[in-house]
Amino acid sequence: MSSLYYANALFSKYPAASSVFAPGAFPEQTSCAFASNPQRPGYGAGPGAPFSASVQGLYSGGGGMAGQSAAGVYEAGYGLEPSSFNMHCAPFEQNLSGVCPGDPAKAAGAKEQRDSDLAAESNFRIYPWMRSSGTERKRGRQTYTRYQTLELEKEFHYNRYLTRRRRIEIAHALCLTERQIKIWFQNRRMKWKKENKTSGPGTTGQDKAEADEEEEEEE
């Protein structure tokens, strides 16, 4: 009871809203009336509003795009020409051959160069002296045993030049080749000549005659 009394006393101190504001102070206008006011440009649905026309085109024909094409909608809404939608990639396709690494002209040039190199290699002539085989190797210095050297020195002491028959006999006896016997005697004669430089010219002539005789026997 006391709470109701205090509530009535509180609200009785403030007057009603209708008594405070005079009637007609605020005109009653709805949002639709505000939007349709012709004095406010840009908000009405006038004939010069392209965006509203495009929106109407979007939702015409049952709320879909069946009644109007996309080109027509954008043309009406944004002022684009119909030729703007007919763009193609012809310039890009024309310049693609120059940009792409697989250029047919370059590929043909590389192929011709390769063919010319192969033809030049095939025509290159290789002579026998230019060929190197793995079996051929530098011959090392021949070493003779003590027995072989002793026997060769004995033979050289008796005869400084050997006939072919005698050279073959010594080669078989010492297990050497004829070429090895011949080389050894040549080196031994050179050594002997250096040791006997003080000898007269008669000795040199005699050695030359013996050498010629040995060459005739070899033939």
From Swiss-Prot:
Single annotated GO MF: DNA binding
DNA-binding segment(s): 137-196
Compositional bias (Acidic residues): 210-219
SUPFAM superfamilies, per database record: Homeodomain-like
The keyword NAD appears for this protein: no
Keyword Cytoplasm: no
Stored Pfam families: Homeodomain (PF00046)
Family: Belongs to the Antp homeobox family.
Name of the protein: Homeobox protein Hox-B7
Record organism: Rattus norvegicus (Rat)
